[in-house]
Curated annotation (Swiss-Prot):
It is found in: Cytoplasm. It comes from Stutzerimonas stutzeri (strain A1501) (Pseudomonas stutzeri). It holds the Pfam family PCRF. Its main location: cytoplasm. The modification N5-methylglutamine is found at Q237. Signal peptide: none annotated. This is Peptide chain release factor 1. Peptide chain release factor 1 directs the termination of translation in response to the peptide chain termination codons UAG and UAA.
Length: 360
C-alpha cells in the first residue's frame, strides 16, 4: 500500500482515539448536537480502523511466516510457505477494501432526494413511459425500505404522467439514485399501433439531494411569488373547499415548484420550499460539476441532464446503459423494480474511476 495512504490511515487512527475519548466526555454527552456529530463521525471512521488494525495484524503474521522460511526443518518451511501465501492473499483483499473505504465521500450520499420524472418526446407514449419509470423507482424504493411521497403530478391523457415529482426518504437514497439523472429512452410498439411499428419515446429524470437545512441555501422571501389554488390531487372532498395547493416562483431564476398532495396549505408550502431549496442548490452545484467534467472526463456522474444515459428496448427485452456500455437482457426485471442490476455496475465503475484518481 502507498505510503500516502498509510499516512492517512495513521491520522485516522489518531482521530478515532480522539473521538472515543470525546464520546466519553460528560461535557460532550450533555451537548446533544456535538454528541450526535461526533457519533456520526465515529460510525464512519470505526469500520476503517477495524480493517486497518486487521491489516496490521496480517502484516505481522506475514513477517513472522517469512522469517520461518529460513528454518532448517523442511516441514516448518513448507508450513511457512502456506502461511505466507495465505497472508499475502489476505493483505491483497484488505488493501483493496481499505482503498475503497478511503475514497472521497460525497457529502450528499446519505440524503433524501427529490425525484423528478418528465415526459419528453413521444407524446402519449412518453407519458406512459414516465409512469413506468415512476413505478420502477417506487418498487425499488420499497425493496430498499424507503418511503416515496408524490409532491406534484400531471397525468397523461392515456395513462402515466406528463410530469411526476416525488420525495424519496430513507437510508443512502442519493448514494443509490444519483446516477439516474439524464435522458431515458424507450423503444416499443404502442398498444394503439396497428402496423406493429416500433416507436421511440423519451423521458428525463432528475435526482436532487434534499439540503439538510434550508438555511444552507439563502432564499430571499422578497424574491418569491407564492400562489395558492385548489388541489386536484389527493384529499377527497376537502380539496374542493380550500385553496390548499401551493405554487412558488423564484423570480430571479424563474424556477417554479408546486405541491398539492397535502390537505394542509402549511405542509404543502413547507414541502415546496424544501424542493425549491434543493433546485437552487442543484443550480449552484451545476457549475462545479461542469468544471469537474471538463477537467477530467467521467464516464459516470457527469450530471448532464440532457445526456442520453439509458435505452429500454421492449421488443428485444434489452436494457442498455450507454455510459458504461452495459447491456442486460432482463428488461422485465429491471422495469419491475430490479434497478440494482444497473445501479450496482454504475457504482462499481464510479469507484474504479475514483480509485484510478487515488493512484494518480
Amino acid at each position: 500500500m502507498k505510503a500516502s495512504l498509510l499516512n492517512k490511515l495513521d491520522i485516522l487512527q489518531d482521530r478515532f482515539e480522539e473521538l472515543t475519548a470525546l464520546l466519553g466526555d460528560a461535557e460532550v454527552i450533555s451537548d446533544q448536537s456535538r454528541f450526535r456529530a461526533y457519533s456520526r463521525e465515529y460510525a464512519e471512521v470505526e469500520p476503517v480502523i477495524v480493517a486497518y488494525r486487521q491489516l496490521c495484524k496480517v502484516q505481522q503474521d506475514l513477517e513472522g511466516a517469512q522469517a520461518l522460511l529460513k528454518d532448517s526443518d523442511p516441514d516448518m518451511r513448507e508450513m511457512a510457505e502456506e502461511e505466507v501465501a495465505e497472508a499475502k492473499a489476505q493483505l491483497e483483499t484488505l488493501e483493496a477494501n481499505l482503498q475503497r473505504m478511503l475514497l472521497p465521500k460525497d457529502p450528499n450520499d446519505g440524503r433524501n432526494v427529490f425525484l423528478e420524472i418528465r415526459a419528453g418526446t413521444g407524446g402519449d407514449e412518453a407519458a406512459i413511459f414516465a409512469g413506468d419509470l415512476f413505478r420502477m423507482y417506487s418498487r425499488y424504493a420499497e425493496k430498499q425500505g424507503w418511503r416515496v411521497e408524490i409532491l406534484s403530478e400531471s397525468e397523461g391523457e392515456h395513462g402515466g404522467y406528463k410530469e411526476v415529482i416525488s420525495r424519496v426518504e430513507g437510508d443512502n437514497v442519493y448514494a443509490k439514485l444519483k446516477f439516474e439523472s439524464g435522458a431515458h429512452r424507450v423503444q416499443r410498439v404502442p398498444e394503439t399501433e396497428s402496423q406493429g411499428r416500433i416507436h421511440t419515446s423519451a423521458c428525463t429524470v432528475a435526482v436532487l439531494p434534499e439540503p439538510d437545512e434550508q438555511a444552507a441555501v439563502e432564499i430571499n422571501p422578497a424574491e418569491l411569488r407564492i400562489d395558492t389554488y385548489r388541489s386536484s390531487g389527493a384529499g377527497g372532498q376537502h380539496v374542493n373547499k380550500t385553496d390548499s395547493a401551493i405554487r412558488i416562483t423564484h423570480l430571479p431564476t424563474g424556477i417554479v415548484v408546486e405541491c398539492q398532495e397535502e390537505r394542509s396549505q402549511h405542509k404543502n408550502r413547507a414541502k415546496a420550499m424544501a424542493w425549491l431549496a434543493a433546485k437552487l442548490q442543484d443550480r449552484q452545484d451545476a457549475a462545479a460539476h461542469k468544471e469537474i467534467s471538463e477537467t477530467r472526463k467521467l464516464l459516470v456522474g457527469s450530471g448532464d441532464r440532457s445526456e442520453r444515459i439509458r435505452t429500454y428496448n421492449f421488443p428485444q427485452g434489452r436494457v442498455t446503459d450507454h455510459r458504461v456500455n452495459l447491456t442486460l437482457y432482463s428488461l422485465n426485471e429491471v422495469i419491475g423494480g430490479a434497478v440494482e442490476q444497473v445501479i450496482e455496475p454504475l457504482l462499481q465503475e464510479y469507484q474504479a474511476d475514483q480509485l484510478a484518481a487515488l493512484g494518480d
